[in-house]
């Protein structure tokens, strides 16, 4: 059965060698522990989010390391280790603790899964290292659970809700029911989107929560159907979003209700196809085909992986490059000094435009409102989006005045 989505008037929501930043790295005298910087990639290698990060994240980080070595020729070694956190907070935090204690890891990144990231953030602060959350979405990471040792890099649930959520409500989608992944990310995405809906005159009629990597969405979708809400907001991601959409199609739910995918990635569109997703509006921090810079990186990535990079994978490359440049500029791998350099240096590369890291660790940068093309409009493989608007980081992300982070001076 063909699945009907929000059209242009009432659009469903999704959130979602390379050039370096224009600023030159000014090296200081080097004082690197063991004369080596070691980066850990903690990701989902085999689960529901593996297409978003996974092996592609490992590839992106290795590309960043290789490119940095070639361009800057640092006088210290750079190595990478990686592991599968299995979407379990205890597995992830234990692995990171082991890396810090026994393997000399200086920085950990990717970190898909907000529950894992919240646990890793605590260990990272305790061990005085650095973690850069690229794949996680919960705003808790820069609000009540912020630390001086962590950065939230690519996107968050506030930006997802704020950029495109308003468009849905203002174009008639004013009653909502949420289908929510039952962990930190899903809770955060539901809350932030609910706030946007209510602030713009809409109503939230209810919600239901499903476990991560749910095997059957029928009972949850039937509750959503019974609510008679105009919009069923999918506060989940990856395989859960894909399976939610497929199940809704099978049950015929979209005859009378519309689905809003609150975080989707280009790999989700690729899996579902343009026939299913045409007309959707999405918010993302990256699109492979945006300009010559993104295409140049993406071609190299595609040659290695046979798919185009997600926002997370491109963000991993950018985050690692930003970190390594800060190490050179600081002349040390000591976390506080490196973090100070990162926060004081603008970020402008193929991934982040007008980027900067705020005092709460939130990296703000331009976000993009895009629309999924019709099949007839797509001219080549992965030609999926039209960019409809560029939203500045200051407008897309939560204002510092609303931050609950104790590091923010008010």
Where are these regions (language model features)?
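Extracytosolic ligand-binding ectodomains
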Residues: 2-10, 20-410
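Repetitive helical segments and hydrophobic/amphipathic motifs
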Residues: 13-16
């Amino acid at each position: 059965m063909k699945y009907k989505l929000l059209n242009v008037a009432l659009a469903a929501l999704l959130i979602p060698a390379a050039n370096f930043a224009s600023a030159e790295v000014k090296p200081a005298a080097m004082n690197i522990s063991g004369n080596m910087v070691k980066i850990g990639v903690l990701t989902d290698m085999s689960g529901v989010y593996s297409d978003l990060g996974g092996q592609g994240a490992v590839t992106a980080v290795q590309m960043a390391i290789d490119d940095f070595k070639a361009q800057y020729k640092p006088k210290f070694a750079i190595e990478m280790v990686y592991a599968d956190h299995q979407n379990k907070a205890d597995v992830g935090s234990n692995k990171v603790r082991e890396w810090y204690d026994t393997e000399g890891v200086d920085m950990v990144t990717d970190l898909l899964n907000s529950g894992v990231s919240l646990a890793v953030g605590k260990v990272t602060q305790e061990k005085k290292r650095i973690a850069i959350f690229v794949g996680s979405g919960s705003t808790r990471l820069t609000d009540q659970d912020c630390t001086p040792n962590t950065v939230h890099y690519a996107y968050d649930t506030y930006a997802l809700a704020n950029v495109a959520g308003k468009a849905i409500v203002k174009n008639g989608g004013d009653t909502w029911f949420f289908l929510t992944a039952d962990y930190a990310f899903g809770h955060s995405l539901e809350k932030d989107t609910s706030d946007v809906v209510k602030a713009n005159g809409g109503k939230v009629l209810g919600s239901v929560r499903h476990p991560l990597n749910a095997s059957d969405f029928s009972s949850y979708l039937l509750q959503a159907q019974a609510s008679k809400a105009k919009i069923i907001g999918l506060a989940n991601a990856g395989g859960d979003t894909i399976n939610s959409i497929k199940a809704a199609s099978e049950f015929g739910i979209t005859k009378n209700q519309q689905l809003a995918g609150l975080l989707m990635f280009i790999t989700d569109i690729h899996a579902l196809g343009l026939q299913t997703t045409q007309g959707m509006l999405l918010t993302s921090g990256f699109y492979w085909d945006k300009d010559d810079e993104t295409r140049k990186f993406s071609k190299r990535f595609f040659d290695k992986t046979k798919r185009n990079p997600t926002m997370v994978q491109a963000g991993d490359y950018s985050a690692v490059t930003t970190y390594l440049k800060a190490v050179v500029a600081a002349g040390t791998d000591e976390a506080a000094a490196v973090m100070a350099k990162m926060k004081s240096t603008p970020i402008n590369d193929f991934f982040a435009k007008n980027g900067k890291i705020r005092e709460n660790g939130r990296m703000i940068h331009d976000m993009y409102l895009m629309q999924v093309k019709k099949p007839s409009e797509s001219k080549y493989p992965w030609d999926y989006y039209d960019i409809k608007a560029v939203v500045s980081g200051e407008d897309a992300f939560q204002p510092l005045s609303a931050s609950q982070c104790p590091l923010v001076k008010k």
